[in-house]
């Protein structure tokens, strides 16, 4: 019998909070939220503020709102149909944008990053990429990566190459530069080596919109 792996959303949420901080009254955006796993895990760890769950799939958002109701955070969750390349939000209207796993599927990733920058308020932060969370158990991280490798191998060498290229730090840096980001950091190596101590981190593009960057 295949051993069940623990949920990684709580540990990823911890990493997002560590980078973005917790302040009262914040507006958060879970971009590419799907059924809301990460956004709702984060809501459970902050006492106030609003979570915008954004996804192009209305069905996924319906499931996210159902889950929000079941987890007691429905009053602070807002579902918005939208995609990264054209976010239906005003300029400088949110405090934090994060996205786990959807970045690899954006049609125009550089444009999506420009949109994230546009909607961030001065002082806002963004964390875009994928991973299991730095606090994810070692045994589970190794098993997750092993299963992931097997899944990609079954799709053929081209799929393996594309998968690795999408998660390469150089790819993240190139896209950030194409988007015109002035200051950013890429953390993690892509989470492809199960023996690496920071493999659970995965890979993330992190940046802040400072007041002096506006104008």
Place the predicted regions along the sequence by residue:
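Conserved alpha-helix/loop element of class I SAM-dependent methyltransferases that forms part
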Residues: 7-24
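Class I SAM-dependent methyltransferase SAM/SAH-binding core
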Residues: 27-86
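A short acidic, Gly/Pro-enriched loop at the edge of an enzyme's catalytic core
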Residues: 85-96
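A short SAM/SAH-binding and catalytic strip from SAM-dependent methyltransferases
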Residues: 96-109
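A short glycine-rich, Lys/Arg-flanked "PGG" loop and its adjoining helix->strand segment in the class I
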Residues: 110-122
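Conserved class I S-adenosyl-L-methionine
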Residues: 125-152
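Short alpha-helix
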Residues: 162-180
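Core SAM-dependent methyltransferase catalytic element
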Residues: 179-215
């Amino acid at each position: 019998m295949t051993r069940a792996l623990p949920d990684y959303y709580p540990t990823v949420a911890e990493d997002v909070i560590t980078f973005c901080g917790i302040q009262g009254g914040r507006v958060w955006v879970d971009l590419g939220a799907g059924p809301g796993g990460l956004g709702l895990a984060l809501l459970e760890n902050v006492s106030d503020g609003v979570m915008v769950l954004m996804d192009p799939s209305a069905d996924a958002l319906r499931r996210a709102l159902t889950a929000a109701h079941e987890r007691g955070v429905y009053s602070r969750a807002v579902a918005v149909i939208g995609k990264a390349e054209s976010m239906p939000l005003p300029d400088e209207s949110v405090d934090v944008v994060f996205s786990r796993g959807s970045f690899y599927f954006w049609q125009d990733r550089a444009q999506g990053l420009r949109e994230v920058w546009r909607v961030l308020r001065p002082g806002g932060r963004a964390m875009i990429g994928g991973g299991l969370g730095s606090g994810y158990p070692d045994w589970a991280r190794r098993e997750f990566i092993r299963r992931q490798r097997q899944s990609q191998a079954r799709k053929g060498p081209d799929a393996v190459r594309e998968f690795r290229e999408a998660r390469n730090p150089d790819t993240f840096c190139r896209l950030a530069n194409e988007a015109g980001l002035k200051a950013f950091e890429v953390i993690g190596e892509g989470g492809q080596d199960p023996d690496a101590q920071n493999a659970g981190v995965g890979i993330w593009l992190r940046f802040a919109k400072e007041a002096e960057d506006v104008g």
